[in-house]
């Protein structure tokens, strides 16, 4: 009991000192009792903001999440875009029912109307949403010695999900050499993005692959299982295809040469050049009698 009382007295002394220093520097004291708030989706959430040292406080709440910016409260009043979902009080703001889009950073800014005293504090709101079934992308067949990229993702989880991979029902470690079952594999696994890269692919990489998404809220969710075959490069097939192509190309060249040697191209040229057109001027006749005489001789 004595130790707890001593700790409580120390915290009170520090808080009082902070207020006095803030007043001396022209800066009000603003604090929150819960800097990180975690709430399941569709539940109410209270973001606390208490302040002192302001003669006529004006409170604003600003929202940021990545590139998104918003104003929740301005001059002690909830803005139009939030007025049906949020309530303002001297101790903070309260969401009636949060959605996943409400996840982000909320900054409580307090100032005097004259602007001489100012203070702020930031509260992080994390709306908890269970992960959905991950979408998996696994090639059905890859060539041994090449690079293969397997992906796994889901968009609903909040906070964002992390990913695990399973091969033939066994969890794949981050370091393949740490598990004898994967010691012959060479891969990198990114738990944040869900990307699994084999580089290079080996014969032992053939198997059934499954991905699992988890974000620490609700139960992990697994994807469908997809089979991948690691196959040898078909050198014989490539050689056969090249051989057939060369035969066809040779036959085409021979056909052109044969036609040329038999004079088929020359005959075609002569047949075109022998066609002549003879045109004879009409004889002079009377104005009342006109007749065009022309003949075409082929």
From Swiss-Prot:
InterPro entries with a match to the protein in the record = F11R (IPR042456), Ig-like_dom (IPR007110), Ig-like_dom_sf (IPR036179), Ig-like_fold (IPR013783), Ig_sub (IPR003599), Ig_sub2 (IPR003598), Ig_V-set (IPR013106)
Q: Where are the transmembrane segments?
A: 238-258
What's its membrane topology? Single-pass type I membrane protein
Any single biological process term in GO: regulation of membrane permeability
Q: Which residues form the Ig-like V-type domain?
A: 28-124, 134-227
Q: How does it assemble?
A: Interacts with the ninth PDZ domain of MPDZ. Interacts with the first PDZ domain of PARD3. The association between PARD3 and PARD6B probably disrupts this interaction. Interacts with ITGAL (via I-domain). Interacts with CD151.
Name of the protein described by the UniProt record: Junctional adhesion molecule A
Q: Which organism is it from?
A: Bos taurus
């Amino acid at each position: 009991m004595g130790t707890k009382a001593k700790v409580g007295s120390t915290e009170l002394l520090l808080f009082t000192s902070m207020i006095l220093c803030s007043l001396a520097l022209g800066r009000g004291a603003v604090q929150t009792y819960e800097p990180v708030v975690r709430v399941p989706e569709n539940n109410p959430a209270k973001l606390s903001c208490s302040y002192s040292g302001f003669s006529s406080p004006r409170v604003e709440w600003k929202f940021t999440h990545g590139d998104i910016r918003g104003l929740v409260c301005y001059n002690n009043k909830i803005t139009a875009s939030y007025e049906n979902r949020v309530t303002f009080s001297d101790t903070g703001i309260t969401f009636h029912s949060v959605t996943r889009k409400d996840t982000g950073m909320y900054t409580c800014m307090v100032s005097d109307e004259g602007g001489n005293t100012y203070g702020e504090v930031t509260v992080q709101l994390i709306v908890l949403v269970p992960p959905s079934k991950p979408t998996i992308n696994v090639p059905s067949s890859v060539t041994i010695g090449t690079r293969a990229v397997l992906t796994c993702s889901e968009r609903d989880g909040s906070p964002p999900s992390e990913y695990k991979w399973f091969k033939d029902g066994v969890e794949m470690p981050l370091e393949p050499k740490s598990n004898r079952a994967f010691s012959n594999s060479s891969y990198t696994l990114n738990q944040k993005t869900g990307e699994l890269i084999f580089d290079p692919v080996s014969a032992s990489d053939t198997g059934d692959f499954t991905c699992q998404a988890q974000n620490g809220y609700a139960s992990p969710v697994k994807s469908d299982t997809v089979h991948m075959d690691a196959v040898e490069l078909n050198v014989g097939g490539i050689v056969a295809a090249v051989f057939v192509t060369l035969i066809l190309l040779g036959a085409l060249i021979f056909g052109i040469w044969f036609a040329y040697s038999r004079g088929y191209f020359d005959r075609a040229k002569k047949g075109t050049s022998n066609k002549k057109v003879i045109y004879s001027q009409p004889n002079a006749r009377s104005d009342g009698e006109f007749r065009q005489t022309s003949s075409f001789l082929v």
